[in-house]
Regions:
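Mixed-charge, glycine-rich, non-catalytic linkers/tails in nucleic-acid processing enzymes
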Residues: 1-18, 106, 112, 137, ...
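Conserved RNase H-like, two-metal-ion catalytic cores of nucleic-acid enzymes
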Residues: 2-140
């Protein structure tokens, strides 16, 4: 550039940008859910892994629900989920509330601990997407990891992913739409689906 020699800068190299230091993340503690859970948890499912066995598609690794609190990951059986879903001492940010409401209602509950659903938020933010999966949303929202977890690879990024999605909903001016219409509707639809299945079952039994 012609200004460089004029100001005597031709021997001066620009300072290289400092490289971002690689931070070594802690490994999550994997432990059973406490008998008396309390506080705020993030709940999601590790998707099932399928593969071929001869000509048949088989499940190589079943879907597995888990909860995250700070840097602890709790693998969840159905009984654990039921203890979380209607618990006055617990609040839950979840990804995909529909099957969780179904589990709660099947156990005589209502899923009252669920306060936010990331899958519903993803739909609201991009209604044209063909599917909504945590593994695809993490790079889309550049969600940072708080820890690593070999058994549940997405667990460490859930907190940042959910925070970024909440911020995006606020930035789009859609808090009221989400909180007052979409989120309550999810619970109602889950109840209607359950009731519809029960009605159909009774009707089939009467018809038979």
């Amino acid at each position: 550039h012609s200004l460089i020699p004029r100001f005597g800068l031709d021997g001066v190299a620009p300072e290289a940008a400092a490289e971002e230091e690689a931070v070594e993340l802690p490994e999550a503690e994997l432990t059973p859910l406490p008998l008396t859970p309390a506080g705020h948890y993030l709940v999601a499912a590790r998707p099932a892994v399928t593969g071929k066995q001869g000509t048949r598609n088989v499940v190589l690794q079943p879907e597995s629900w888990y909860a995250v609190q700070d840097t602890t990951v709790y693998p969840l059986e159905d009984a654990d989920l039921v203890r979380l879903l209607d618990n006055a001492d617990v609040t839950l940010d979840v990804f995909n509330s529909a099957p969780l409401y179904a589990k709660a209602m099947a156990a005589g509950g209502w899923g009252s601990s669920i306060v936010w659903d990331g899958k519903l938020a993803a739909y609201l933010l991009d209604a044209s997407a063909s599917k909504y999966q945590i593994s695809e949303l993490i790079p889309a929202y550049k969600a940072a990891a708080a820890f690593t977890c070999t058994d549940y690879p997405d667990a460490g990024r859930l907190a940042d992913l959910f925070a970024r999605m909440k911020a995006e909903i606020t930035a789009c001016g859609e808090d009221a739409l989400y909180n007052e219409i979409e989120f309550p509707l999810a619970q109602v639809l889950a109840d209607m689906t359950r009731t519809g299945v029960l009605v159909d079952k009774d009707g089939i039994e009467q018809f038979g």
